[in-house]
Amino acid sequence: MDMYQKREMRKNKKMEENTKSLPSASINWYPGHMARTLREIKHDLKLIDIVLIVLDARIPHSSLNKEVYELVKSKTVIMVFNKSDLAAIPSITEAQNKYKKDGCYTICTNSVTGEGIDKLKELIRTLGEKIKYGNKTSESFKKIKKVYRALVVGIPNVGKSSLINKLSGRNSAEVGNKPGITKRRQWIKVGQDIEIMDTPGLLSKNLNEDNRGERLAIVGTIKPEVIDEELIAHTLISILMSNDWYMSMFKARYDLDPDIDSLTEPKILEQVGRKRGALLKGDRVDTLKAARILLEDYRTGKIGKVNLE
């Protein structure tokens, strides 16, 4: 059996396992939090000119809450590909083209460094003026104080609050590196002419659809206490081993043995743990610690630009 057959077997095995690592009954996003926020968004849409849907550029389809999108798509929508520095450009471009076909605008941002923020402000103003004022050019019109209102939505831990703080130039929204930081809606001013409403992060109803739950867990959207981090790390290893470029970066990062293709995901995780000194008494590998090291390295881009879709 050659290495390509082994990779195909690994891929099929993960498909069969589906999302056993996600105890969906423990993820209590419904009905209260989600249903209430959806009602509030629906109520507030009449005040809104533009909707910014913040996506994780590594999982631009899995990070879209379809229920929210169906609710807001009657408005002008900008798909914001955040964390674009962590994703491979060809995959981003492919996803952008799909959303453009659906009538959405797209832009890439990095809410940590501020890359793309000025372009996003410019796009909000350009679209906002077109939506609210059409082609008016009179002198009296030019003197009107223009205000454009945008609603920001997205899944937990996608960088919404950091993005808003970069837009506003101050710490207006609560920020953290774990899901569920923003608890309420709030209006935030951006300069003199843009007002942004932040909303709590909203997970999709069905985390098992197309294995999206596993991808969301890998990027850190789902709280670690409700998932099996070792099984999620196994899923990440399976993805890394299914692509020659990803595999080469993975091996280089942890100085792994060249012939690890023949090993199972748990055995590969043990190698990662041993290389990183995640050891218990008796020279046993602390596989939970190894899983956390691997997941954190992926989330912070230390393995490389790896897309999960």
Specify the residue positions occupied by each region the protein language model found.
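Alpha-helical scaffold segments in soluble metabolic enzymes
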Residues: K119, L123, S162, T235, ...
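Canonical P-loop GTPase G-domain recognition
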Residues: I78, S84-V153, S172, G277-L279, ...
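Glycine-rich, phosphate-binding/catalytic loops in enzymes
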Residues: Y69-L71, A95-K98, G169, R212-L216
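Conserved active-site beta-strand-loop modules that form the wall/rim of enzyme catalytic pockets
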Residues: S111, I164, I194-M197
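Long, charged, alpha-helical interaction scaffolds
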Residues: I53, K100, E115-G116, G128-E129, ...
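Helix-rich effector regions associated with P-loop NTPase G domains
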Residues: M1-V51, R58-I59, L64-K66, K73-V77, ...
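Glycine-rich phosphate-binding P-loop
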Residues: Y148-G169, T199
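Short, structured loop/turn "capping" segments at alpha-beta junctions
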Residues: I131-N135, N165, N171-N177, N243-S248
